[in-house]
């Protein structure tokens, strides 16, 4: 699934009739979108609805997004380090989401304003408003 997202982005990047590309992962696609963004350059904005996904839980990784050795590789901490300082909206994350670490990463990247984190899931209207900002 992650590779499919990266491949789709590469295809869009190859087209002259496509402008800015943003990623929006809703429901179970939120974590895949977040992981794919770490491997894709040139994405304008990324919005990941984690739908309660708890990156501190082995069970979550096993049941919802099995990636061998992801925890040993730094899980979402490494992902956010690769995404920063890109625009990132994360919402609906489980209790184990490393919010303080995410904020520190964006501060170190010099763009703390580009990370938006909400505990609750956002409405579609809020997401559309955020993702279409210039």
Regions found by a protein language model. Name each.
Residues 35, 75-79, 94-105:
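Short alpha-helix in the alpha/beta-hydrolase fold that links the catalytic acid
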Residues 63, 95-100, 106-134:
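C-terminal catalytic histidine-bearing segment of alpha/beta-hydrolase fold enzymes
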Residues 14-17, 39, 85, 104-111:
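Secondary-structure boundary motif
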Residues 3-79:
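Primarily recognizes the serine-hydrolase "nucleophile elbow" in alpha/beta-hydrolase
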Residues 84-95:
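Conserved strand-to-loop "acid loop" that flanks and positions the catalytic carboxylate
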Residues 19-21, 88, 113-115:
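Hydrophobic anchor at the start of a short beta-strand
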């Amino acid at each position: 699934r992650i590779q499919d997202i990266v491949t789709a982005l590469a295809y869009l990047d190859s087209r002259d009739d496509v402008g800015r590309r943003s990623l929006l992962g809703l429901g179970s696609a939120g974590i895949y979108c977040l992981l794919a963004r770490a491997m894709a350059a040139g994405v304008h904005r990324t919005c990941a609805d984690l739908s309660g996904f708890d990156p501190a839980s082995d069970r979550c990784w096993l049941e919802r997004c099995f990636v061998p050795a992801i925890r040993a590789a730094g899980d979402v901490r490494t992902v956010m380090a690769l995404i920063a300082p890109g625009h990132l909206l994360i919402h609906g994350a489980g209790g184990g989401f490393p919010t303080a670490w995410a904020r520190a990463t964006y501060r170190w990247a010099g763009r703390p304003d580009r990370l938006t984190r909400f505990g609750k899931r956002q409405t579609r209207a809020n997401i559309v408003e955020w993702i279409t900002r210039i």
